Amino acid sequence: MKTLLSHRSIRKYQNRPIEKEILDEILKAVQAAPNWVNLQHISAIVVQEQQRREKFAELCGGQKHIAQAPVFLVFCADFYRTWLACKEKGQEFDSVVSQIDNLIVGANEVGIALGTAVVTAESFGLGTVPIGDIQLHAFEAIWELNLLKYVVPMLGLCVGYPAEEPGQKPRLPKEAVCFEGKYNSDLKGLLKQYDEQYAVYLRERPWNSRVGDWTGMAADFYRPPYCHYPEVPEMLAQQGFLSQR
């Protein structure tokens, strides 16, 4: 429980490799994570070579910590094995996998797998930071990873021994996230309360201190015209995930 409640993102890492035994335990935990009807629609690709980590740092918008961390994991929604199973049984697959609910299933399983990897890594004293920008240059990432049709890179994860103690970001009030019985849309007061707390955090933290609050950050991030990952629609079509509904 202490590990779960003390999570923080690490972006500076020691020049120290991760022991093979520990990496194997992380991957075992990923495979043991919950999934949909045991179809196991994820794959995790381990990138350790320095040159390749530098390449992924570049593809993910110049995030230097990807090159610095000794291990970069790429989590993929993977329906290729399912395609092989259907092909073996003489069953058509493309019209099924292109329905949007399958993409949601794959994204759900990737999230569960990555969360499992984070907790397992941190239980060994390692630090992590998830990387959403693996989709920024999606076609190059697919080429670098040799991904076939029906496999989509969803998230990356830096893993290594921490070289910093950045502290934790304050979270939203529990009442704004966890509800009893039904959703509560009356959140303005809670968001105002959180804005005040977050503004103090941003102003007083020892690194990258600035003036701002949470609602301002959220609105700025999603300011129109929003097109954070422009390659994604075409990439999903190429990989077989294109809804017909």
For each feature predicted by the language model, list its residue ranges.
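Acidic, surface-exposed loops and disordered segments
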Residues: 1-245
